[in-house]
Amino acid sequence: MTWQQRITTALEKRRATDAFRVRTVVEGGAGRFLIRDQCQFCNFSSNDYLGLSQHPAIVRAWQDGAERYGVGSGGSGHVSGYTTAHHALEESLADWLGYSRALLFISGFAANQALIAALMEKDDRIVADRLSHASLLEAANLSPAQLRRFAHNDASQLNTLLEKPCDGQQLVVTEGVFSMDGDSAPLGDVQATAQRHSAWLLVDDAHGIGVLGDEGRGSAFSQHVQPEVLVVTFGKGFGVSGAAVLCSDSVADYLLQFARHLIYSTSMPPAQAVALQAALKVIRSDDGEQRRQTLAALIQRFRAGVRDLPYQTTDSHSAIQPLIVGENSRALTLAEQLRERNMWVTAIRPPTVPAGTARLRLTLTAAHQTQDIDNVLEALYAAG
């Protein structure tokens, strides 16, 4: 099979199963509304959970940072790209989350890949929740370590897998809030199980940080857990982009030596770090708390409203509210029916989710209003 035949075959297979992905050009895709072809849609696909991407103080901070530092960092943090803005943000994050150190990464995907690649050796074992993010599972598959996956949120099966003989070290991997189902990991049980076997715990809290817990400290803090390694990302609750790894001094020093994604990547623009510092200030403020309360009320209203819909829901009390419809074609049809009513909802299909669990993945944000929730519920019942 030639290169072109291989590519053509793969694309034809995706099209035949209604799993072909396309991008849509829009304007204002992070806000309450987005524009496509001069039409306005109420946006239920954004991860901007607290509505901070449009926050005037954060926008101004990025502008001020660009005035001071320029628009790029100019290099890796190991060369010339580690500025006072980067250092200050790392210090603030570590203090906020109760860790010795924080290291900035350009994305959550890069952070997860770097961590697992740097930490794991061939005699080691990774035991990951079956629904962990693609960045974690891909990194685990590419690493020299053995990968075993436990049933979703099943600490008992996790214990069984950790009991099996292992010549090296064991790393337990999970998420704080799961990106496709929106439910939370029982981090207390998971950590206790890991500790019983001297395993380390890595938690990716991309969808919990900024949104859950006191001052938005996230899933681990709200469940009174401190994993050995915590990954937080800035494209959701923070409304910006990028990521950080929280860890001990020794792990941070180790990653600075061996995390190739960190060493060989241009660091995030200093202006972005300035904006993230401003976002953190908002998250920790009364404004941030009010946004979290607003979001929680909207989530409660939505969940109460979907009870009689003929779709499967999950045990999600987060901003991620999936409606599982089963077939790919059904999910696509529903998404299109909602867009005809000016509601922007995304259909999620395999391989992103397991076969037979295609869904509408609605995300709620503090920028939404009560009427938006009522409108999308009315549209869902009309389409149902």
UniProtKB/Swiss-Prot annotation:
Its EC number is 2.3.1.47. Substrate binds at residues 21, 133, 352. Pathway: Cofactor biosynthesis; biotin biosynthesis. It is an enzyme of class 2 (transferase). SUPFAM superfamilies: PLP-dependent transferases. Keywords: Biotin biosynthesis, Pyridoxal phosphate, Transferase. GO terms for molecular function: 8-amino-7-oxononanoate synthase activity; pyridoxal phosphate binding. The modification N6-(pyridoxal phosphate)lysine is found at residue 236. Belongs to the class-II pyridoxal-phosphate-dependent aminotransferase family. BioF subfamily. Catalyzes the decarboxylative condensation of pimeloyl-[acyl-carrier protein] and L-alanine to produce 8-amino-7-oxononanoate (AON), [acyl-carrier protein], and carbon dioxide. This is 8-amino-7-oxononanoate synthase. The lineage of its organism: Bacteria, Pseudomonadati, Pseudomonadota, Gammaproteobacteria, Enterobacterales.
